[in-house]
Amino acid sequence: KTGQKTTKVLYPQLEVDDHDNPAFLALADGNILAMYTWHGGKPGKWGVIQNVTSQPGDVTSFSDARVFTPRTDELVKKFVRESYTYANPFSLSAENGRIFCFGRWIGYKPNLIISDDQGKTWSEPRVVVTSPNLDVNNRPYVKYYSDGTSKIHMIFTDGHPRVEPTNSVYYCYYEKGAFWRADGSKICTVEELPFHPRDASVVYRATPETGKAWIFDIVTDKGRPVVAYTRYPTDTLHHYYYAIYDKGAWSHHKIIESGRWFPQTQPNTVEREVNYSGGLTFDPTNPEVLYISHQINNRFEISRVEKKKGGKDWKITPVTRNSQYDNVRPFVPRYRTDGQKNILLWMENRRYIHYTDYDSSIRYQYIK
């Protein structure tokens, strides 16, 4: 309303690493819960970090940071590896505001903890998805989306596309104490966790010919899950895809060939993150609209793409063009309420060599 910006340092002891960004959850009383982690961490500097405001809407009222390690000796013994990366909290009104927080913790796998007191205390962790034969170097990547009422939708991969030559995409959702496939059949209850990727719904089965995949976003369109992901026929060919589950099957639509990775590979070096695409995200209020980052004249630019009738073609509208710097990782915040403006955010990279070596700004633009 005023154009003024207010800032608050939540925790001053993180490493320089772009994985260490927070997720925010609006609590039932209007306060905001922030949760985040180091990138893996090490004893003494690892675990999940959280802050909560004491005055709704006032970021200056964030509490001091609380650091905790969601672990049990039994779980660590069974799944061997202990590290803490990512924190993704969601609240379900149908379960009296119960909070579910997911992250990559014990076993290097997606874990789940639950709170029934707005984040003051948490349950013991459970591993959600694991490899059929435990591999502590295998790490499924997950994206989440919740309706805020009863469901938490998940898309995930076998692992990292740098490691998995046929990295595929899977889907499931949580509801009423259990995890379910897209067709509504049950995978398992929370108490029966973990399950394997093959137990969930297959969104995209990768082959050497069609290319391994990585995931970028998930929302719902009239209750149907819609997914944004990338296929890599080769590491220098990044193809953006849209998929929707409708009438019992997944329908896939190619959006664009987006270019290659965005890290600025230095001379006489081998790129470490060849699957770092510019990125794409849904406008969750209109899932037929996405915002993408793609290469134009060797610069990464942001565009708005809208699915045309029939779903096979896309209308592309520029957001940035002729930029001095690369523009990557667009994102439209979820859960906008009536009267709130819709905002597109993205990273502007003056330099991005690696996720530990970058000089970036977060830019934003109001969108319809």
State what each model feature region is.
Residues 1-368:
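Extracellular, repeat-based ectodomains that mediate carbohydrate processing or recognition
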